[in-house]
Amino acid sequence: MEAVTRPSAAEGKRVEKRHGLDAVLCFLLVLISLLGYLRTMRPTFGWGDSSELITAAYHLGVGHSPGYPTWMLIMHPFSRIPIGDVAFRVNFMTAFLGAVAVALLYLVYRTISGNRIAGFIAALTFAFAATFWDQTTEAEVYTLHVCLAATSILMVLAWRATGRDRWVYLLSWLIGISLGNHALTALMIPAILYFVYAEKGREYFTVARIAKCAALFALGISIYAYLPIRALSNPPPHLNNPHSLTEMWSQLTAPGARQAMFDRGWLVPIQRAGFHTKRLIAEFGYLGCALGLFGAGLLWRRDRKLSVFLTVIAVFDIAYSSNFSIFDIYVYFLPLHIVWAAGIAVGVAAVLTLVGRGMARVPETLVSPTPVWRYGPAAAMLMMLPFMQFTNNLRRVDGSEDYGSERFARAVASMAEPGSLILADWWAIAPIGYLKYIEGERRDLIMFAAPSIYAEEGFLDFAKQDFLRSYPAIYFVEMLTYRMHLLREKAYLVPQGPVYRVYVDRPPREDMLADIPATPTVRFGDQVGLVKIERASGAIRPGEPFAFELYWTPLEGYNGKNHEAIFVLENEEGGRIWQESNLLGHDLYPLDEWEQGEVVKEEHRIYLPDPVEPGEYNLYVRVREHGQSACLGCDRPLDGHNERDYLLASIQVGEPEAFSERGRVPTVVAFLRP
């Protein structure tokens, strides 16, 4: 039985006072962090994971591999609170969990450094590091991951301080629960095992303890039973529900992600080590990196076991993330950032101690001996570190005006014909799915985002089964068409704003060319000419996009490369309201054999963003080679405007007439020019 020593009354009061001060500092950290996170929070559903996770949480569904059951069960009740829309609720809870994680990390850093001021500064520095801050701006699993990771480290430290087995048992259960949120938790297990062994030795690992820990771990990780249970009701978004043991295994092991592991040879991890260094500088700045290194060295000398524990977490994180090739790999650096901020805490504590000793030697006639005067000036200067983090990263992570994913989804929903098939990658499918499964908009649309869509044999199978021909209309999202070479070679793709309309059976090429003289109204460089612009036929209904037709022709200097037409909407003061691009693809039929003298018609649709006020606006077009940042010169720019933009039309936006989730949608009432 564990021995329990009752503290004296005086000691108990001191403990209460310390705990009360910690509670106040934790509250301040939550408040400061949350205010910063709400300032930059995205106002709506985002691309990819964000929309998918919101949709799944609202319906108690299954996310992409491995499913994230812990996150779903926590977020579901909050997604049902009738405040704002569903996206706001889940985004807010993500930000709130981020703020709670910062408070938990303060307790970790205060314990490691032995200094509250140092713990406060280190936690606030982590709070406004770019990667973590960015994860608080929209629905994501990583703020909860940091919460659980910080709690796990606190339990390790509590076990060390008390020696009570209950912390080990509770930690075993929590690790299982944490794995139900993200697999990054597994990287902590070797460090925890080392620390327990270093503290207690081999004799601590008795059969009884191991059995209890294993049972509690199994209880925690049994949260994955959520996946097959919920799959029985097939909840939205319907992309990941496992209905068999094979599908369950595939969901847990993420075969698509495994293909990106250890796939680049032995040189890439070495190159990634340099990338880690650059990211650390970007996250914490030179001052934060210097303090982190200084603190890491001090911790190694003072507490070797704890230092190795944190180092093992960092090393396993670096080794794992350096061998994983995904576009958002930077979020996998968060365990390293947690460890680095611990070094910052130790470094800040050491600086404060040195300054305090120096100030103690100053005569009391010059400086008051109170702690405020001994440590206050140095603490205020070191507080510049999180302040610089905030100011440097604010613009990088600010998503408060980011409506791009919602505008895209509403544009697709408004232009797609009834019963259409939408083929896209997960990043574009998810926001359309939010409209369908949460707002109930366009429930007739069929969306397909399976991995086999990228495989040529998969497309051939669909074609053999007349899969594509069975739908009244098919749309492809632009990014995906760059990868689907076979589709571009076999089908006819017509650009329509943010998507391509797919015609499985190509019409004759001569039928696709406009029978008008190829005399350009405006030239973009010596490569592409715009012959004319026409308003598309048909009335514009409130809330729907307005359409126009552009007629393009190649010029003498045309080099056979793909070009992008970029459309920009500006107000009368020249402020940009909206922008999107469209591919004039040379390898898209019928432009694959485009020749001088031929004119091709392109239909384009624009969906106005909600914040557009009634008034007059100018619509410009500019052209650039695909993949280039510089645009081609325009030979007929508007007076007083830059030399790359051609004025397509001036449009009159009237009073809003249709309702969206956030309010009324602006409507184009007239084309003033041309």
Predicted features and spans:
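Transmembrane-helix signature of polytopic, membrane-embedded enzymes
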Residues: 23-26, 105-128, 147, 166, ...
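Hydrophobic/aromatic-rich transmembrane helices and adjacent perimembrane loops
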Residues: 308-311, 319-359
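Hydrophobic, aromatic-rich transmembrane alpha-helices
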Residues: 282-304, 357
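Perimembrane helix-loop-helix junctions
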Residues: 160-161, 187-218, 361, 385
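Transmembrane-helix motifs of polytopic, lipid-linked glycan transferases
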Residues: 27, 92-113, 151-155, 294, ...
